[in-house]
Every structure is written in structure tokens, then in C-alpha cells.
Amino acid sequence: MPSLAVPHLTPISNEHLVSSKEVVFFWKNRIEMFEKKSDKVKQAEHKARDDGVELESQFIMRVPKELADTVHEAINAGTIKDRLTIQLDPDLRYGEVRIDDQILYTKLVDLPTVVESYKTIDNKSFYKSADICQILICKEEREDETEKESPNKNKKKDPNKVDKKYLFPHGITPPCKNVRKRRFRKTLKKKNVEAPEIEKEVKHLLRIDNEAVRVDYEIINEEDKPMDELEQSDIKPYNDADDDLQDESTMHASEKTIMEMSSQRHLQVESDDDEASNFPSHRAPNMGVAVHDIFGEEVSSTDDEDEPDRGNNTMQRRVMEESSRLSADDSRMSDFFGASGSNTGAGVVKMEQNVFSKSMFGHEASSPKLSAAGSSSNLAAPSGFYDSQMLAKREEFENMEFIDEPQPQYTQQQVQQKINQLTRQIRELKAQQVQKSTEIASIQNATLKQRMQETLDNLYTQVIERELELKDFENMLES
């Protein structure tokens, strides 16, 4: 085992040391050859470097606690050169350290942190000498030979990659414990990308662009694009059938809302009749049916003033959502609700008074639909809920026959222009179909092929729509 002598050791004051049990040595990275001379002349001759620059590497030597004081005393006394020797293996990872007569087995590992070291001559000016990124750990027990041998001995190693057993997990300060695991994430592995296939697809797309008759492109900045601008694909043509469907759905929504409200009243009245025996005895008998007779206890009290009326807000929100579904532009619905405005106004006044008459809760159902939509009990809807005028209006509305609005009248010249325009559009769409079909036949990528097929199906749909419109205008022209 070759011996590397330490010709000069410079002690560092305790304020620059991380721990009093660690000593920093300046180990010169130069090969020194010592030859035995005669007893009169014994001096070391070293081989000079070609560039004349002596570089040095620094590391921290960590020794056991009982020997740390001995090393500090030797450094302060200036006898460290005679009392301490360091011997390292050729791989510069394992070695031995002799302190007086005691031998320690060492291992040089890499720190996860970098510590800067400074030198001074006059204790006033400091200059940086090196970056300390290794630590020499000294132990009394020899390390197992199995740990020295790498398990992946036969594998090809990267010369720039350090073996994991030489990577120290901790720093030199307590906050840096397990810093390598906590601070540094694992290196992401590069995914294998099939470059030839991608290059082939790109060349194919470029070849299609070169063979195209015309290529149009437009640069659109999404930030500068106004919000009210709509794409042509999002604008649907006006159709009278859609309007009729909307009117029908609005009518069903209004009927459903009325039926749900009546069913809720049925449930409340039934529960109140079951709990009639629990009413307080001091209530006046001639007051009629009050709010608490139907809804039980009071809706709110002074104890709940701190909290908002969540139930009322929720109910109002539901009513607003249901009412928002109704179309305000529908003349038939406005006529229906306008005629019954007086009756509903009277109903609101009654609700505000919070007093109900017992005649409202009869046993005969005023409407078969409402009785069917109510609760499963024998209690029917109140007889005075709908008056005769309201029922007459409702029957008139249900029996009303909806007449389609008249289509706009076109002159013969306008019809001919529409026919020419639709014929030109159909011709252009069919030309695009032929071009897209040719492109799809030559595409091998499944995802791109599916996307192109969707575009082709859209073109087929547009052609069918234009042909139907063309047939309508041709019929108008013949008539």
C-alpha cells in the first residue's frame, strides 16, 4: 500500500469548524517520491509539475470521540506530522490512518453539500482556498470485504457516475440529516421515442401539403380574440321545429312545477292532521288554520337571527331556477299567466296574511292530475285552490292546437339565388370529400386517421343538409 505523506497541516480555529470532533486537512494532490539518503542528509525530493502550479484538495476527517482531543492537541503542539499518517488505496476510497500507536480504518465518501474553506495570513484578510465535498470517516473496525466489492461488478459502469456506497446521505450539520434523500429527487429516465415513425409521419404530412392545390393558414391570438365572436360551426340555422319543441318543453316544465308544489302541500296537510292532538290548548278556536297548523313550528325565531335563513334562500333559489326555465317570449304562456294574474294576486295576499280557512282542505280533488301527483294518502287537493276561471283557462290551453308560424316569403329571384348558392356550396363540399377521402387512404396513423374520418363525416352531414334545403327551394320555385 503506497504511503502519502502530509507535509504541511494548517489548523483552523474552532469558530470555522462545524464540530470540535472533526479536523480539516489540506491534502496536496501531487505525487511525492521519497528516497532514502545517507544518515547525514535525509530530505525529500519531489517531482516538480510542468505548469508550476500546485493544486490541493481538501476533505474533512472524522475520527472517534476519544481520539479527537488527541488530534487537536497534536495540531496545536505542531507535532501532528510525526504522530499522524494517512495511507490510501489506489482507488482513493479506502485506507488506514495511524494516530500514535492506534490504527483506524477509513473510507472516503462524497458529501451531498459543498463547504467553502478560507485561509488567512494576518487574521484580517481571507481568501478562498477550496470547496470541501468529501469526508474521511475513520472507524476502529474494518469494513466487511463483501461491502467493498460492488454487487454489479460485471456490469459496465459509467465513469462519471459515483457508486451509491460512496455517497454519504447526511451533511455536516444537524439540519442536513438525510439531506440527499430529502433534497435531491431521482433523475427522470428518458422515454424511448420512436423517432423513425414520427419522422415518417411528418414527411408524409409535408408531402400532402406540397401536393395540395391550395393551402390557407391563419394565425389567431386567443388573447386578442373578442369574446362575443362566435365560430360558424357553433351557429345553428333557425328552425321552426326547434321553436315548437322549446315551447312544448316549457309547457311541461310549468306543469311539473305546479304539480310539485301541490304535492308538497298535500304532504304538509297530512302531517298536520296526524299531529292535531299535539297542538297547544290555549289557541283560540275561532282563529282558523294558521301557519303553524300547516308547517308545524315557527319558521324562524329570535334565537336564529345570527344565522341567515338558509332554507328560505334555498327555496327562493329553486323557484328562480324553475321560473328561469320558462320562456318570457312565449306569447301563449304570457297570455295564460296574464289572465290568471288577478287570481294569483289574491292568493299572494292570503299567503302574506298567514291565515287559511278549513274549507280549502276538502276531501274532493279539484283536478285529477293534481290528485295523482300528490301524496299517497286519501287527502286530496284543496277545493278552492283552483277556481272555475283558472280551470277553464287551463283546459283551453291544453286543448289549444299549435299552428306553425308562417315561413318567410321569397320572391322568384331570391329563390333562384338561394338555389345557385346551395348548388355551389354542395359542389365545394363534395370536392372536399374527395380530397379528404384521398388523404385518409394514405394515412397510417390510427389517431390521425380517426380525426380525419370525423371531418369527413361532418362534410357528409353538411352535404345532406344543403341538398334538403335545395329540394325545398326547388319545390318553392315550382309552386
From Swiss-Prot:
It is found in: Nucleus. It comes from Drosophila melanogaster (Fruit fly). One of its GO terms (molecular function) is RNA polymerase II general transcription initiation factor activity. Residues 148-166, 318-332 have a biased composition (Basic and acidic residues). Residues 143-167, 268-287, 299-332 are annotated as: Disordered. TFIID is a multimeric protein complex that plays a central role in mediating promoter responses to various activators and repressors. Pfam families: TAFII55_N. The gene is Taf7. This is Transcription initiation factor TFIID subunit 7.
